[in-house]
Amino acid sequence: MQELIRPDGSTINYEVLGSGEPVLLLAPRGISSSAAEWDNYFVDPRVLADNFTVITMDQRHAGASRAPLAPFSHNDVFADQIAVLNVLGIQSASVIAADFYCASALKFACEAPARTRSTVLIEPMGLDDSNTMDVYYAVFNDSIRQARAEGLESVISAAETNPIFVDNTEAGPWCHRLHDQPGFAQAVRSLGRETYIALLVDFRDGAFPWDKRYFSVNELEVCNASVPLLITPGNDELHPAGVAGQLHKDATNASLSVAGRDNPDKLLEEIRKFLQENN
């Protein structure tokens, strides 16, 4: 993978596969979104590299990328994604996102339509009548509890066992960096317990702001977006079907996929056709 250094010191790793019209992939697994997470997902759009230039990336809190000790910001991760396209000289691309980073794909559609040819949302997260913010805040409960009850040394020790936050929430959202860069532990220690806990809360609230149904953009922005959207509904509290349905209703140029987890091969066919029609 290639590495891009961002103004705030973050490093973003990305890889280019295939040739053809550009498609940016934003992987599943929440904060732990790295290109490798496509390996075990029910559908792997990297196979589109047989017809398209596919760009994969590790988001700043995952994989080989690195993030500073700062709250999560949808603006920051969106800027990372734009920066990857810029360094590759890509003026516009289609965007395929799964899970949490559908929020970034929506920012492409709503805030950068000139850079966005089409957008595919696979099982987007968000709020509807079937869930509450507690569903998303729960991911951080163990992080806060571990630091408060056991202290920062226990957080650092937890990170040594597993660098993937969604599988090791006690270690906090910087666990991939603590795992791979032992010297980073001193930066965590220097915060002190209470400041670290406050930072976790700010990180959580930045990732899942209570006042935005889709987390990164508001409903009016979605209503005003004209970029073609293909949406695959989820079927659980984290990925409610109602969120996909509301997006389909709000957006002016959106369609729902026929296939989903029940038929990933058919879903890939739908995605391929959608990209070909909107490139």
Q: What would you call each of these model-derived segments?
A:
Residues 6-66:
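Conserved HGGG/HGGXW glycine-rich cap/lid loop of the alpha/beta-hydrolase fold
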Residues 46-47, 55-94:
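Active-site loop/oxyanion-hole signature of alpha/beta-hydrolase fold enzymes
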Residues 95-98, 122:
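Short beta-strand immediately N-terminal to the catalytic nucleophile in serine-hydrolase-like folds
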Residues 97-105:
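Gly/Ala-rich beta-loop-alpha elbow adjacent to hydrolase catalytic centers
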Residues 110-111, 116-149:
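Flexible "cap/lid" loop of the alpha/beta hydrolase fold
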Residues 149-202:
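Conserved alpha/beta-hydrolase catalytic His-Asp/Glu region
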Residues 193-245, 257-266:
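Conserved serine/cysteine hydrolase catalytic core
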Residues 249-279:
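Catalytic active-site module of serine/aspartate enzymes centered on a nucleophile-bearing elbow/loop
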